[in-house]
């Protein structure tokens, strides 16, 4: 048995003031792809040959430049064309929240182009992030599609391996099935879908119960993605039957799950405490019990924001007689990074931190001591899946 493996991951925030280009992607071709995806062992355990295709990962980013996407899509499809006569199936990891200029969803476009080449019957399985958008055409052209259960996505590697195992079993048993899709008229943000909180915890428990049915192979609830404008935005339900004769039964289960989620629509809420910036600052200053974590949700780089806001930093710098030790997460400023990269560890330097792109990213003058330089890594669970460049840790003097 031979299965082609490819991956395209981009989460497109249309508010980001830049286009995602080829240099923004981690690109891998060859056997290293399997290790980075965390799926090498499953193929060895099942005695199945994985044909490594192409991997492109920009993580959370912006609208993708069309030429960049065309290149990536071409590389993924080239691998399939080169091995089409020996393939028993295709496994793809597609995030689901990409948006390409002049095209729309890159994920959907890739699958449509692949189906033009291999036809409607070659088994294709997709693992994906639940924060992606679906359509009936996209889902039902797949034999299997499975999203992560957990948010944060601590089960990402587990889900990829599970999806591959489902594909292998499907190929071995020669069942002609396809995934079933239901659309929900519901749009949610990631902060409203934390899996340790209700109602997502109950939804996941219900899906686990549904999968105990021998007629059902896989069940997924897809939260959707709302940070770019597209007609397919919103929640979706996917159910995959174990056998062709259970296809209609899967339709019923999809309706049941759709109703279950819909009936909980008023339970969705923002997890955690939220406050306006001035109130949040005061809460942090007055907290004397334990470490206080304050996040600027409007500058969330894991959703494609720029990461260059200095607003909260300037709030703390304006506090007179500050009695607390404050650790700031990364602030993006490539010019200041280059300046600090030239000096030695423990050396001091005067810097202007801030990109001055707008009012929120105004620069501030700081006298700092360089402490450390290291990679900024991206982790899913315990698996390092990529890097986001390098960062420099400094101590503000005075």
What is each residue range found by the language model?
Residues 4, 8-11, 15, 66-73, ...:
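Active-site histidine-anchored catalytic micro-motif
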Residues 47-51, 55-68, 72-80:
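Low-complexity, highly charged intrinsically disordered N-terminal segments
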Residues 77, 111, 164, 281-284, ...:
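Generic structural signal for well-ordered alpha-helices
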Residues 160-208:
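Conserved anion/nucleotide-ligand pocket segment
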């Amino acid at each position: 048995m031979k299965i082609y493996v490819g991956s395209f991951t981009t989460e497109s925030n249309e508010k980001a003031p830049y286009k995602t280009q080829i240099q923004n992607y981690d690109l891998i071709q060859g056997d290293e792809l399997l290790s980075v995806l965390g799926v090498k062992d499953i193929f060895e355990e099942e005695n199945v040959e994985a044909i490594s295709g192409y991997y492109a990962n920009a993580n959370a980013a912006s609208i993708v430049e069309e030429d960049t996407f065309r290149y990536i899509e071409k590389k993924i499809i080239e691998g399939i064309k080169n091995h089409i006569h020996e393939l028993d199936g295709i496994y793809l990891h597609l995030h689901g929240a990409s948006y390409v200029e002049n095209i729309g969803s890159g994920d959907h476009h890739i699958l449509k182009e692949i189906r033009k080449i291999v036809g409607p019957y070659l088994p294709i399985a997709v693992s994906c992030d639940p924060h992606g958008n679906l359509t009936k055409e996209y889902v039902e052209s797949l034999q299997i599609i499975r999203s992560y259960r957990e948010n944060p996505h601590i089960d990402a590697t587990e889900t990829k391996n599970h999806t591959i195992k489902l594909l292998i079993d499907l190929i071995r048993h020669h069942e002609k099935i396809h995934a079933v899709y239901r659309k929900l008229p519901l749009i949610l943000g990631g902060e409203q879908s934390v899996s340790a909180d209700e109602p997502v915890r109950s939804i996941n428990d219900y899906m686990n119960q549904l999968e105990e049915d021998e007629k059902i192979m896989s069940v997924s609830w897809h939260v959707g993605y709302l940070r770019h404008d597209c007609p397919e935005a919103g929640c979706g339900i996917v159910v995959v039957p174990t056998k062709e004769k259970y296809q209609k039964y899967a339709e019923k289960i999809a309706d049941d799950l759709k109703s279950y989620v819909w009936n909980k629509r008023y339970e969705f809420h923002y997890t955690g405490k939220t406050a306006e910036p001035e109130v949040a600052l005061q809460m942090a200053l007055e907290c004397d019990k334990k470490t206080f974590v304050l996040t600027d949700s409007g500058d969330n780089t894991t959703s494609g924001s720029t990461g260059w806001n200095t607003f909260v930093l300037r709030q703390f710098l304006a506090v007179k007689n500050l009695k607390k030790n404050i650790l700031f997460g990364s602030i993006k400023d490539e010019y200041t990074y280059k300046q600090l990269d030239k000096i030695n560890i423990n050396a001091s330097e005067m810097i202007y931190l801030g990109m001055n792109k707008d009012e929120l990213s105004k620069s501030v003058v700081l006298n700092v001591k360089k402490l450390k330089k290291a990679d900024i890594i991206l982790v899913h669970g315990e698996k390092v899946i990529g890097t986001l460049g390098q960062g420099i840790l400094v101590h503000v003097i005075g």
